[in-house]
From Swiss-Prot:
Its EC number is 3.1.-.-. The keyword Nucleotide-binding does not apply. This is Ribosome rescue factor SmrB. HAMAP family: SmrB (MF_01042). InterPro entries: Smr_dom (IPR002625), Smr_dom_sf (IPR036063), SmrB-like (IPR022990).
Length: 186
């Protein structure tokens, strides 16, 4: 036996002798915080899911009569907000958030747009950038139609060249705190 192994054998024997008269403690404390957090997270995620579905519900109307044939695509909810659209066309609004719909199905794209609107309203972001791409022109044709159906969309216009030109849209979203004072965009 070498010197190091003798110390480990002796020390383990001493340790066992030292703990010989001890007994195991019974854990009698019950922790509920973990379960409550789990339930709260579940309720929060469920509420967010319902909010996103509520926003994507507006996109479910299918009767589009090719409303957006003109190029570039633009929309304004009400003529009194024409200055917003004019500033949007001039590129005076820089989007704070962006979403890419490339490779998504129509249903997934609707869900993603609902998530975008929910996020923008929670974070108080009024300008968003939506990349729909070229592809087979399915999302390119449907996205403006879906956005025009949503009551919280103030205006949108084809993105400037820097943001993707005709493969993207810049959107102005109404935020609840700005509903009273819509002239902030002027």
């Amino acid at each position: 036996m070498d010197k190091n192994s003798r110390y480990t054998v002796d020390s383990s024997i001493l340790f066992r002798q030292w703990l010989n008269d001890t007994r195991e403690m019974v854990q009698d404390t019950i922790f509920h915080s973990r379960i409550q957090k789990k339930n709260n997270n579940h309720l929060v995620s469920q509420r967010v899911f319902f909010e996103q579905n509520a926003h994507s519900h507006y996109f479910s109307y299918r009767n589009n009569k090719n409303l957006f044939k003109e190029n570039p695509v633009s929309y304004i909810r009400h003529q009194s907000l024409y200055n917003v659209l004019k500033n949007l066309k001039k590129g005076r609004y820089n989007p704070d958030i962006s979403i890419d719909l490339h490779g998504l199905t129509q249903h997934q794209a609707q869900q993603a747009l609902g998530e975008l609107i929910t996020t923008c309203q929670k974070e108080k972001i009024f300008c968003a950038h939506i990349m729909h791409g070229h592809g087979k022109h399915i999302l390119k044709k449907q996205t403006p139609f879906w956005l025009s159906q949503h009551p919280d969309i103030i205006a949108f216009h084809e993105a400037p060249k820097f943001f993707g030109s005709d493969a993207a849209i810049i959107v102005i979203i109404e935020i609840n705190s700005l509903k009273k004072n819509i002239n902030i965009f002027n």
